[in-house]
From Swiss-Prot:
GO terms for molecular function: ATP binding; tRNA binding; tRNA-uridine 2-sulfurtransferase activity. Catalyzes the 2-thiolation of uridine at the wobble position (U34) of tRNA, leading to the formation of s(2)U34. Residues 170-172, 332-333 are annotated as: Interaction with tRNA. It comes from Haemophilus influenzae (strain PittGG). The active site is at C123 (nucleophile), C220 (cysteine persulfide intermediate). This is tRNA-specific 2-thiouridylase MnmA. SUPFAM superfamilies: Adenine nucleotide alpha hydrolases-like. Pfam families: tRNA_Me_trans, tRNA_Me_trans_C, tRNA_Me_trans_M.
Amino acid sequence: MLISNTYNQHFPQLTQEQIASNATKKVICGMSGGVDSSVSAFILQQQGYQVEGLFMKNWEEDDDDDTDYCTAAADLADAQAVCDKLGIKLHKINFAAEYWDNVFEHFLTEYKAGRTPNPDILCNKEIKFKAFLEYAAEDLGADYIATGHYVRRAGDNENAKLLRGLDANKDQSYFLYTLSHKQVGQSLFPVGEIEKPIVRAIAEDLGLITAKKKDSTGICFIGERKFKDFLARYLPAQPGNIRTVDDEIIGRHDGLMYHTLGQRKGLGIGGLKNAGDEAWYVVDKDVENNELIVAQGHDHPRLFSKGLIASQLHWVDREPIRESLRCTVKTRYRQQDIPCVIEPIDDETIRVIFDEPQSAVTPGQSAVFYLGEVCLGGGIIAERI
């Protein structure tokens, strides 16, 4: 039996009754080959559950895609090594077709329309908490699935609530707002109750191969490649003019899809005559005319919005908001909470008014709402106001 003193210091000892109850429950833990899922599986073991791992392959590499292939192969090898060390079975499943149909094609459509989508949110919605959850329950007989996400849940089954992770720096509730209370109730999030350094310390105690493995960053199907190079393989770029808010053409862009609101670097328009020293920022995209709109200064009024319109709403309790609600919102990951008021337009659309104007609110991204620690849900930013 593997032992971690760090685990013993940070997790309460369960009663024999709790362990006996957990022992009747089968949990399939999604194993990514990273430290968070590795430690999640160990925690579940310590709590008495019947634990098995599952490695998902969500992307098919091209034959010339050596970098990504090696990454996927290495991740699988690490996941297998961890499961071997923990003494648990590792299942393998290929969800690449589901990923292409339900995540990647939507990603391309949104970029084509000049919006900036977040595929990780869609991946959680369509793959990890739908395809994986269904496969685990129906084919593997799971009572729960588990992942290495930094979130917590309160309550069970129909009453489950999604809470922020204990580690504010790692909280991933922003990426899970589309989950229903039912999905939350069928999921366990073991590392959501602790901070990242403790996760690594537990992995070190156990001698896991993933203990010092760096966290994966960026979009899963792009890996370490340059985003621009990857996107160019699927969407032909349409170069166009860069126009100032004063209606002056000052340069050319190589495709609207490569730029996002609030962007400062990589515009190629520095050193313009009589332009002053202030940096240029993207303040808008004119999709109809294929023009990138820019202005000088990080506090230019065109960068700011007093609110937003959101659609494609998902509330964790699946009850639409039908009256004004004061809460907080994040319009991008790791942003400080913004105090706001939600004003329902209809069951599918809301108007959100910020207490103070906010910079670089980006259509296509998600607005996610909170009441204290509870993640209420969210929607896609349709427009800024």
